[in-house]
From Swiss-Prot:
Designated gene of the protein: prsA
Purpose of the protein: Plays a major role in protein secretion by helping the post-translocational extracellular folding of several secreted proteins.
Catalytic activity: [protein]-peptidylproline (omega=180) = [protein]-peptidylproline (omega=0)
Protein name in UniProt: Foldase protein PrsA
Keyword list, A-Z: Cell membrane, Isomerase, Lipoprotein, Membrane, Palmitate, Rotamase, Signal
Intrachain S-S bonds: none
GO molecular function: peptidyl-prolyl cis-trans isomerase activity
Signal sequence residues: 1-24
Species for this entry: Lactococcus lactis subsp. lactis (strain IL1403)
UniProt cross-references to InterPro entries, sorted A to Z: Foldase_PrsA, PrsA_foldase, Trigger_fact/SurA_dom_sf
Lipid-linked residues (N-palmitoyl cysteine): 25
Amino acid sequence: MKFKKLGLVMTTVFAGAALVTLSGCSSSDSASKDIITMKGDTIRVSDLYKEAKQFPSQPTNTLLQNLTFDKIFTKDFGKEVTDKDVSKKVKSIKDQYGSQFSSALQQQGLTEASFTPYMRTQMLEQAAIDHEIKETQYTDANLKKAWESYHPDVTAYVVSETSKDAATKALDAAKKDDAGKASFEKTNAESKVTFNSTSTSVPTEVQTAAFKLKNGEFSDVIESTSSSTGATSYYIVEMVKTSEKGTDMNKYKKELQNVIKTEKEQDTTFVSGVIAKYLKKNNVTVKESAFASLFSQFTQTSSSSSSK
């Protein structure tokens, strides 16, 4: 199992050199050597060693990136991401994984003790991304674009089968007569769901077919292949209650903003641009040559995007 990693914070890019390659690190006075400087703060060798003890399985680049991000995002969003908020999030994830929590942490090179500061950094980055989305992306043009493909809530039976033959037989039986339809609905009562075009639990192909149906109508057999598992499923949809979005976009403004938010959170170029913005704002400078390219994945992506 893997915990969701926001943006590009927890990258697994190894530094070209390990901790021991830092020039002068073997001397007794090296602890105060600057690795990264920024407005009002500094990351020294001693900070890196401390971070390495807490996250022994993380590569050096990741340690330095997260130390930097924690500092720069705390300046703007530290009051938004409180200890109470972090504890609540940690508890939620722990409850979600249950008895598998410890093993899931181990797979990520984390412990219960280190997971809290890890999650805090994740939440700080998310706060920065959300702020940028709110300030720059909820434009009329973006809302209108999201509106074009948006469909409001519908309620339907969404039934999946592992073979096309099984799905075809189930569909034929359901469409045969009223008794067949009633049997289909009773058998698949737990498959009655409400969803809209932003739902992630219903495949896109199924949504497209469902939104064309009138109340009481059945779809043809719909084939959908999971991008994560590669498995193909065959779906049948019976529409219970459809809906029309009408012409009033403002009625669904919140939903459309969520569409934009989800899209931008998954846009690595946008996320890199947000990080690059705060790196520049805080005048983050890498002093140690071994880590000269530490933030290039963010700044280069941002520059490439802005030049288009």
